[in-house]
């Protein structure tokens, strides 16, 4: 594998040499002799050469005019073999301890596309900037700006020792940190393809380091396998050093040796490092001659031989080769990615961004890239940034060397070798403690950074202080190889594109001839290149140096902001030299010895550097102000978003509440409807069950309740509909208000954005104008570029915020649409529910009507049936009466016809029975008397028996008679009850019949009334129009008559005057007078004619004016109509023509004219005659209509004039009447006064009588006038009364109609109101009938009560008779008992047997 790698490197280098066609390769024929020398020198010499020492790692940005670069390897990877080669490289690099750059993070999926076109970045590292500077230099030279440059002095400076010393300061960090950054970007490419970070704040602070997957998974294996593989590759790598020769391109082999020596110090435990930002730089000076390059090449060969003698330098050389290979891989891929990235506006770094770390490193910012990796991966990019500013110089003298060796540039090989060896020995022990200490330092710096705004210079000062204090305390910084996996980071944001370089080798680094020799010009040129990363980092690594030269370097370097990838803690190699203990005093002797020359050369740049610092601070202040504005904007955006969300949520809540309430109301209405249906069903069943029964009050009450429930339901539905309609309106208004408010807020936000953009542009232009006035144009240009990048970044942030807000707005609009849809659904549901309810109500009404009609038909049928039944009942009554009469007659006849025989028989029977009874009784009496006489001569039982026997016969007869009478009366009562029931039923049927007839009659009358009401307004309108027409005609006639009368009167007056004049002048003139009279008459006639003609002329002028106005209006309307119709007709005709000939439409598609007007072929074509005729007919009809309107208006005006004249007449008449009345009253008063005077003055009777007569006459006249007035007033009063009655009726009618219109919004309500009225009328009639029925019932009750009272009285009388009889009997019994007592007293004994017999007889 090592051999393969070496061969590959050789092939790549040869190819690179062939491709380079720059002027700097004119002396390339000097290269062949040097590879062997390099091999020999490396084999001979053990010690490290003089130019590799710790001060290479203390690189303080002293590159100046002699920055050198190393050309990178360019690998040719075919598209098909990428996977196999990448696998082989992974295995090889794992074994060799180098990192793998599979795909650069900046290039996502374009690798396969861009691989065949091999990278041109390998041709030269910083050639884009250099070529640009070269162009500027030659432009200045043409203008005569650079005439003051001394080229001999420049060449002397370039050939001096400082060039060799300074170029060595940047090699190790330049090769290590780019490797680290490459690692970082590669891992992101592998893990996050085609993705980039939107988190610009994090990207501003720092970008996390990236690593490959192989490094993530096998960090320890890499480090261990690196130990094993280095010894195997020693010889081959040292052989390769000799082949790397660049003469006039100034990418010399010196750096290869340097980098190999620098990286060979670790004991084969170096972690894989690849570049993200560009190829590793070599220390080639900008303006070296070919002689200088030869000397450098010889020195490199010497170094190679010295390294080749020992085993350890060979190992170190092999590490250099592996690192170089990894660097070249990374560079190639970076270049490939830069091709694709630079054209887009993504956040991926461009070619210039990749090149920038080289320029920054040349200023000494790289000196701190060797950082210890904390065991915690939680340290973020800010920690890395702050730690990046620490002076992590490798300590080469931890055991026995003096600090002087660590500070000054070494000139002896032995010292440097000893330094490296001692550094290697002292590494193992110092690692853990220093790592912990560095972690603490990271945290402290983080706290400081978070507490202070990130400005460039203050942070640099703080970093310098902390680094000096820490390293002045003598603490070692561990760099012993811990393989630490690089963090995944977001890719760096994109920078503005550079001006593309044209040419085949546009990216090749030229020799640097024509570079400005003064350090200030170099700084400005470098600053212009490196300031593109101004906005991405917030701190710059400053290196504390012990001399004034380095201080100035730091001051000038503060303007150069660290690129994104340089902020990360780089993975460190085991055995790399640690930093020495630095004295805090910058004026140490060792530093003074070394840096005397640069002090003199850079003495005049302090003021400019201070100006740059001030400008940097101003730019940072502007940037912080813009950031604060952006934060305010974000806050306002967030607040408005929250407000919008709150409003949307409140709307949703309101709609949910309304839906809930509507559901509740629907539920209530459904429950009411169900209850109503149940009641209606019950009523139907009751109606079906009780059809045969008479219509009672309960049914009417049920119907009334039903109607009331229906009314309440309808009212509820009506109110619900109105309320829902109002709610819907309110919701619509709320939605409109919300939309308007949101639109206003969006407009405000857009206006704020526009104002911010304008402010940014103003700031940008102001800063640009200020910086253009300053002498350092290049520096101001870089500042402006940095500000522009910051503004673009802010703009991108704002655009993203706008996009996000637009998305939020769209989401809110979607939510609003949903809410609207829900609202519409709720409306539809409500409408559906109300429609259903109305439909059900209509169905119920129809069923109710049907039932009512059915019941009415039944009632009608019952009424008709009742008539038949009444007739039948009357016939039956007549028949019964006749039968009873006949029966009575028959009984009478029977009694009359069969009386003698029956009477004789009855008498004979009765006689026989009476005889037997008499015999039995007599016998019994005799027996009893005998017994009584025997036993008890005065005993009562016999007497009692005799009395009871006589009483029984009498009682039986009476009882039978009474029973018969009662039965007869009961039968009569039953008959009367039946008759009453029948009569009631007949009355009910007659009532129903009358009711039906009455309702029919009412309906007919209502229909007639409605018909008449419909006809009445028409007739009224006709009559009113006729009246108006007649009134207008009458007014016209009156006016004409009055005008003629006036004219005639005027003429008569004129003639009278003329007559008078003539009579006066008759005597004087005679014939002349006659002529003058004729002449005057003619003159009068002419004047009258003139006046008449003037009047006619004025009238005609008015008519002409009216007609001109109407004509103008019609013309305007015609123009409007034509302007509307012509485009339509043209479009129609064009459409018809296109339909007929579709190819013509395509063929006429000519470009627009210069004025931008389209050619319309139908614009000036004549319209069809039919269209013209139609237009003419339409205009005529419009003119006729207008004439009619004018005539109507004339009529109305004439009517108004007539009314005015009438009113004037009335006023005049009233005034005349009033004056007459006043005159009459005045005369009366005068007469009264005269009468009083006469009465007072005269004393005779005649005068008194005359006065009385006069007064009586006056009174009579007065009374007559009053009577006449009263008669006139009576007539007018009668007319006014009639009018008032008519008007009152009309007003009442209109009020009723208005009331009906107000109450009855819908025809259903009107119908229900009619039903309600009918029901009220029915109720009134029902009450009246009930009252009549109650009267009838009361009458019948009175009759029955009277009869009952009669019966009761009769029975009372009977009872009284019985009581009297009983009293008589008692008295008789008392007398008998007295007789018996007397007998008993006398001693007469009544026998007991007789008593027993009497008892048996009783039983």
UniProtKB/Swiss-Prot annotation:
<feature type="compositionally biased region" description="Basic and acidic residues">
    <location>
        <begin position="526"/>
        <end position="536"/>
    </location>
</feature>
<dbReference type="GO" id="GO:0005879">
    <property type="term" value="C:axonemal microtubule"/>
</dbReference>
<feature type="modified residue" description="Phosphoserine">
    <location>
        <position position="163"/>
    </location>
</feature>
<feature type="compositionally biased region" description="Basic and acidic residues">
    <location>
        <begin position="571"/>
        <end position="585"/>
    </location>
</feature>
<keyword id="KW-0597">Phosphoprotein</keyword>
<keyword id="KW-0175">Coiled coil</keyword>
<dbReference type="GO" id="GO:0034451">
    <property type="term" value="C:centriolar satellite"/>
</dbReference>
<feature type="region of interest" description="Disordered">
    <location>
        <begin position="453"/>
        <end position="606"/>
    </location>
</feature>
<feature type="compositionally biased region" description="Basic and acidic residues">
    <location>
        <begin position="1128"/>
        <end position="1144"/>
    </location>
</feature>
<feature type="region of interest" description="Disordered">
    <location>
        <begin position="169"/>
        <end position="243"/>
    </location>
</feature>
<keyword id="KW-0963">Cytoplasm</keyword>
<keyword id="KW-0493">Microtubule</keyword>
<feature type="coiled-coil region">
    <location>
        <begin position="614"/>
        <end position="1124"/>
    </location>
</feature>
<feature type="modified residue" description="Phosphoserine">
    <location>
        <position position="160"/>
    </location>
</feature>
<comment type="function">
    <text>Required to promote assembly of the transition zone in primary cilia. Acts by specifically recognizing and binding the axonemal microtubule. Localizes to the distal ends of centrioles before ciliogenesis and directly binds to axonemal microtubule, thereby promoting and restricting transition zone formation specifically at the cilia base. Required to mediate CEP290 association with microtubules.</text>
</comment>
<dbReference type="InterPro" id="IPR038774">
    <property type="entry name" value="CEP162-like"/>
</dbReference>
<dbReference type="GO" id="GO:0005819">
    <property type="term" value="C:spindle"/>
</dbReference>
<feature type="region of interest" description="Disordered">
    <location>
        <begin position="1126"/>
        <end position="1147"/>
    </location>
</feature>
<feature type="coiled-coil region">
    <location>
        <begin position="1174"/>
        <end position="1386"/>
    </location>
</feature>
<dbReference type="GO" id="GO:0060271">
    <property type="term" value="P:cilium assembly"/>
</dbReference>
<feature type="compositionally biased region" description="Acidic residues">
    <location>
        <begin position="178"/>
        <end position="208"/>
    </location>
</feature>
<comment type="similarity">
    <text>Belongs to the CEP162 family.</text>
</comment>
<dbReference type="GO" id="GO:0005794">
    <property type="term" value="C:Golgi apparatus"/>
</dbReference>
<keyword id="KW-0539">Nucleus</keyword>
<feature type="compositionally biased region" description="Basic residues">
    <location>
        <begin position="485"/>
        <end position="500"/>
    </location>
</feature>
<dbReference type="GO" id="GO:0036064">
    <property type="term" value="C:ciliary basal body"/>
</dbReference>
<feature type="compositionally biased region" description="Basic and acidic residues">
    <location>
        <begin position="35"/>
        <end position="46"/>
    </location>
</feature>
<feature type="region of interest" description="Disordered">
    <location>
        <begin position="306"/>
        <end position="348"/>
    </location>
</feature>
<feature type="region of interest" description="Disordered">
    <location>
        <begin position="256"/>
        <end position="292"/>
    </location>
</feature>
<protein>
    <recommendedName>
        <fullName>Centrosomal protein of 162 kDa</fullName>
    </recommendedName>
</protein>
<keyword id="KW-0970">Cilium biogenesis/degradation</keyword>
<dbReference type="GO" id="GO:0005829">
    <property type="term" value="C:cytosol"/>
</dbReference>
<dbReference type="GO" id="GO:0005814">
    <property type="term" value="C:centriole"/>
</dbReference>
<comment type="subunit">
    <text>Interacts with CPNE4. Interacts with alpha-tubulin. Interacts with CEP290.</text>
</comment>
<feature type="compositionally biased region" description="Basic and acidic residues">
    <location>
        <begin position="210"/>
        <end position="238"/>
    </location>
</feature>
<feature type="region of interest" description="Disordered">
    <location>
        <begin position="20"/>
        <end position="46"/>
    </location>
</feature>
<dbReference type="GO" id="GO:0005654">
    <property type="term" value="C:nucleoplasm"/>
</dbReference>
<keyword id="KW-0206">Cytoskeleton</keyword>
């Amino acid at each position: 594998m090592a051999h393969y790698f070496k061969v590959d490197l050789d092939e790549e280098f040869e190819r690179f040499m062939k491709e380079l066609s720059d002027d700097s390769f004119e002396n390339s024929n000097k290269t062949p002799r040097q590879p062997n020398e390099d091999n020999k020198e490396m084999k001979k010499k053990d010690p490290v050469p003089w130019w590799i020492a710790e001060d290479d790692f203390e690189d303080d940005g002293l590159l100046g005019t002699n920055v050198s670069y190393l050309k990178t390897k360019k690998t040719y990877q075919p598209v098909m073999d990428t996977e196999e080669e990448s696998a082989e490289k992974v295995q090889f690099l794992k074994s060799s301890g180098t990192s793998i750059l599979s795909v650069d993070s900046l290039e996502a999926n374009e690798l396969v596309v861009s691989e065949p076109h091999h990278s041109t970045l390998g041709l030269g590292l910083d050639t884009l900037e250099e070529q640009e500077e070269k162009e500027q230099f030659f432009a200045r030279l043409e203008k005569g700006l650079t005439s003051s440059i001394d080229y001999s002095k420049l060449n002397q400076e370039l050939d001096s020792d400082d060039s060799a010393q300074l170029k060595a300061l940047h090699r190790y960090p330049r090769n290590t940190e780019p490797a680290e950054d490459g690692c970082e970007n590669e891992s992101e490419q592998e893990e996050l393809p085609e993705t980039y970070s939107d988190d610009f704040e994090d990207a501003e602070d720092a970008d996390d380091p990236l690593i490959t997957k192989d490094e993530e998974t096998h960090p320890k294996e890499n480090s261990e396998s690196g130990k094993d593989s280095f010894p195997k590759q020693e010889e081959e790598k040292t052989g390769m050093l000799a082949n790397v020769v660049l003469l006039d391109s100034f990418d010399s082999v010196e750096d290869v040796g340097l980098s190999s020596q620098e990286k060979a110090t670790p004991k084969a435990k170096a972690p894989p490092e690849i570049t993200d930002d560009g190829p590793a730089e070599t220390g080639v000076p900008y303006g070296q001659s070919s002689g200088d390059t030869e000397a450098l090449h010889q020195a490199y060969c010497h170094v190679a031989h010295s390294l080749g003698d020992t085993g350890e330098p060979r190992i170190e050389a092999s590490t250099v080769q592996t690192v170089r290979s990894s660097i070249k891989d990374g560079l190639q891929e970076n270049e490939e990615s830069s091709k694709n990235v630079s054209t887009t506006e993504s956040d991926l770094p461009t070619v210039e961004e990749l090149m920038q770390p080289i320029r920054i490193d040349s200023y000494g910012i790289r000196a701190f890239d060797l950082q210890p990796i904390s065991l915690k991966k939680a340290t973020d990019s800010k920690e890395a940034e702050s730690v990046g500013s620490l002076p992590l110089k490798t300590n080469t003298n931890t055991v026995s060397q003096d600090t002087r060796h660590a500070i000054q540039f070494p000139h002896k090989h032995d010292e440097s070798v000893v330094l490296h060896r001692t550094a290697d020995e002292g590494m193992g022990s110092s690692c853990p403690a220093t790592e912990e200490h560095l972690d603490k330092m990271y945290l402290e710096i983080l706290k400081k950074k978070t507490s202070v705004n990130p400005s460039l210079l203050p942070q640099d000062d703080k970093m310098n202080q902390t680094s000096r204090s820490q390293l002045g305390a003598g603490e070692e910084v561990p760099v012993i190889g811990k393989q630490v996996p690089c963090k995944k980071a977001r890719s760096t944001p994109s920078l503005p594109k550079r001006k593309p370089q044209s040419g085949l080798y546009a990216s090749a680094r030229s020799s640097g001839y024509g570079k400005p020799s003064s350090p200030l010009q170099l700084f400005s040129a470098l600053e212009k290149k490196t300031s593109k990363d101004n906005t991405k980092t917030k701190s710059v690594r400053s290196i504390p140096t012990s001399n004034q030269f380095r201080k100035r370097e730091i001051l000038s370097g503060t303007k150069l902001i660290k690129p994104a990838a340089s902020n990360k803690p780089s993975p460190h190699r085991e055995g790399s030299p640690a930093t020495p203990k630095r004295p805090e005093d910058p004026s140490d002797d060792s530093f003074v010895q070394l840096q005397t020359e640069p002090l003199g050369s850079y003495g005049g740049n302090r003021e400019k550097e201070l100006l740059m610092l001030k400008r940097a601070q101003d730019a940072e202040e502007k940037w912080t102000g813009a950031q604060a504005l952006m934060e305010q904007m974000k806050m306002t955006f967030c607040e408005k978003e929250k407000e919008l969300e709150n409003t949307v949520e409140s709307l949703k809540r309101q709609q949910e509440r309304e839906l809930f309430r509507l559901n509740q109301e629907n539920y209530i209405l459904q429950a009411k409807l169900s209850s109503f249906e149940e009641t209606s069903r019950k009523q139907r069943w009751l109606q079906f069950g009780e059809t045969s029964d008479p219509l009672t009050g309960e049914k009417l009450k049920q119907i009334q309740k039903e109607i009331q429930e229906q009314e309440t339901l309808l009212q509820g539905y009506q109110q619900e509909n109105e309320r829902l309609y109002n709610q819907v309106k309110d919701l619509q208004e709320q939605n409109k208000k919300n939309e308007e408010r949101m639109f206003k807020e969006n407009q405000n936000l857009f206006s704020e954005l526009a104002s911010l953009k304008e402010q940014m542009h103003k700031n940008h232009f102001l800063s640009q104008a200020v910086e253009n006035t300053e002498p350092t144009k290049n520096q101001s240009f870089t500042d402006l570029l940095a500000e522009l990048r910051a503004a673009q970044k802010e703009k991108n942030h704002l655009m993203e915020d706008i996009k996000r807000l637009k998305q939020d707005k769209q989401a809110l609009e979607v939510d609003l649409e949903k809410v609207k849809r829900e609202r519409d659904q709720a409306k539809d549901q409500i409408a559906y529910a109300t429609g259903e309810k109305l439909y059900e109500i209509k169905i119920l009404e129809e069923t109710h009507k049907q039932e009512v009609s059915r019941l009415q038909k039944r009632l009608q049928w019952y009424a008709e049936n009742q008539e038949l039944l009444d007739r039948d009942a009357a016939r039956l009554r007549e028949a019964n009466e006749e039968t009873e009469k006949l029966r009575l007659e028959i009984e009478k006849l029977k009694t009359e016809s069969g009386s003698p025989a029956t009477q004789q028989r009855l008498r004979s029977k009765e006689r026989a029975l009476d005889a037997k009874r008499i015999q039995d009784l007599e016998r019994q009496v005799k027996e009893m008397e005998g017994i009584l006489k025997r036993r008890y001569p005065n005993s009562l039982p016999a007497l009692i028996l005799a009395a009871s026997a006589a009483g029984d016969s009498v009682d039986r007869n009476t009882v039978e008679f009474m029973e018969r009478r009662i039965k007869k009366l009961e039968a009569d009562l039953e008959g009367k009850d039946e008759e009453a029931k029948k009569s009631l039923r007949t009355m009910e049927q007659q009532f129903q019949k009358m009711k039906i007839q009455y309702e029919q009659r009412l309906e007919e009358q209502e229909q007639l009334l409605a018909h008449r009401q419909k006809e009445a307004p028409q007739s009224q309108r006709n009559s009113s129009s006729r009246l108006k027409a007649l009134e207008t005609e009458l007014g016209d006639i009156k006016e004409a008559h009055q005008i003629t009368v006036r004219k005639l009167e005027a003429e008569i007056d004129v003639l009278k005057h003329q007559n008078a004049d003539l009579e006066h002048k008759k005597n004087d003139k005679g014939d002349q007078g006659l002529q003058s009279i004729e002449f005057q008459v003619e003159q009068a006639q002419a004047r009258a004619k003139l006046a008449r003609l003037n009047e006619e002329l004025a009238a005609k002028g008015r008519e002409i004016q009216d007609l001109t106005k109407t004509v103008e209006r019609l013309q305007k309307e015609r123009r409007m109509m034509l302007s509307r119709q012509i485009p339509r007709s043209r479009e129609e005709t064009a459409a018809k023509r296109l339909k007929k000939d579709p190819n013509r439409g395509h063929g006429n598609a000519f470009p627009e004219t210069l004025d931008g007007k389209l050619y319309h072929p139908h614009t000036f074509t004549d319209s069809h005659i039919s269209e013209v005729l139609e237009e003419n007919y339409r205009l005529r009809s419009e003119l006729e209509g207008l004439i009619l309107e004018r005539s109507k208006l004339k009529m109305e005006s004439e009517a108004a004039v007539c009314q005015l004249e009438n009113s004037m007449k009335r006023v005049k008449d009233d005034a005349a009447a009033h004056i007459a009345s006043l005159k009459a009253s005045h005369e009366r008063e005068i007469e009264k006064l005269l009468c009083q005077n006469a009465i007072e003055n005269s004393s005779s009777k005649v005068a008194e009588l005359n006065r009385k007569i006069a007064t009586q006459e006056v009174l009579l006249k007065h009374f007559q006038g009053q009577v006449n007035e009263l008669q006139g007033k009576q007539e007018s009063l009668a007319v006014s009364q009639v009018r008032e009655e008519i008007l009152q009726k009309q007003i009442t009618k209109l009020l009723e109609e208005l009331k009906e219109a107000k109450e009855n919004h819908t025809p259903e309500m009107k119908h229900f109101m009619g039903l309600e009225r009918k029901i009220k009328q029915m109720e009134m009639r029902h009450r009246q009938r009930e009252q009549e029925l109650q009267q009838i019932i009361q009458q019948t009750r009175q009759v029955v009560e009277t009869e009952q009272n009669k019966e009761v009285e009769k029975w009372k009388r009977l009872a009284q008779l019985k009581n009297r009889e009983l009293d008589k009997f008692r008295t008789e019994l008392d007398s008998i008992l007295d007789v018996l007592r007397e007998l008993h007293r006398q001693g007469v004994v009544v026998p007991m047997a007789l008593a027993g017999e009497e008892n048996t007889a009783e039983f």
